[in-house]
Regions:
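Classical secretory targeting signals
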Residues: 1-28, 121-155
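Low-complexity segments
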Residues: 29-118
C-alpha cells in the first residue's frame, strides 16, 4: 500500500511542478519571451508582472523587466528595467481595453521615477520594440490584456 501512495504523491508533485510551466514548455517547446501573472505590491500600491525574455536565440538564461500597472492610470502598463533602474516605455490600452501600442522613451527621457518623466516625453503609441539586447531584431510580444482591477485591494 505504501509504494502505491508514494507513486501517487510523486505524480501529484510532478503535476504541480509542471502546472507552473507554460503550455509549450511542458511539451518540450521553447519560449523566447513570456509574461507572468499580476501581483500586488501593497507598499507602493501598484500591480506588477514580470516580462521574461531571452535576449538572443542562443541565450540560456532569461533576462527580465517589470511591467507596472498603477490603478490611477488605468490605460497604461509601464516597463521598468531593474538593471538600469529606469522606466523605458509604456504600453497603452484604449478606454475599451483594446491594445493601442507601445511608446518607447528616448534614452534622455528614461528615469528612475515615473514622476520625473513628463507626459510629453511619451511618443504616440506604435509597434512593440525589439526584445531588449536582441541581435536578430525579434519584436517583444505585447502584454496580455488582462489588466488588474482599477480598485485597489482593501487592507
Amino acid at each position: 500500500m505504501l509504494p502505491m501512495f508514494k507513486r501517487i504523491a510523486l505524480l501529484v508533485v510532478a503535476g504541480a511542478a509542471l502546472s507552473g510551466v507554460p503550455g509549450d514548455a511542458q511539451a518540450g517547446g521553447y519560449y523566447r519571451q513570456y509574461y507572468t501573472s499580476w501581483s500586488y505590491y501593497s507598499t507602493t500600491r501598484y500591480y506588477y508582472r514580470t516580462y521574461y525574455y531571452y535576449p538572443t536565440t542562443v541565450s540560456t538564461t532569461y533576462s527580465y523587466h517589470y511591467c507596472i500597472y498603477y490603478p490611477s492610470q488605468p490605460r497604461y502598463v509601464y516597463y521598468y528595467n531593474p538593471v538600469s533602474q529606469q522606466y523605458w516605455g509604456r504600453f497603452e490600452f484604449g478606454e475599451d481595453g483594446k491594445p493601442k501600442g507601445y511608446s518607447l522613451l528616448a534614452e534622455k527621457d528614461r528615469k528612475e521615477k515615473l514622476a520625473d518623466i513628463p507626459e510629453s516625453a511619451f511618443p504616440k503609441p506604435a509597434a512593440m520594440p525589439a526584445i531588449p539586447g536582441t541581435n536578430d531584431n525579434e519584436k517583444m510580444e505585447a502584454p496580455p490584456a488582462d489588466l488588474p482591477p482599477k480598485d485597489l485591494p482593501k487592507g
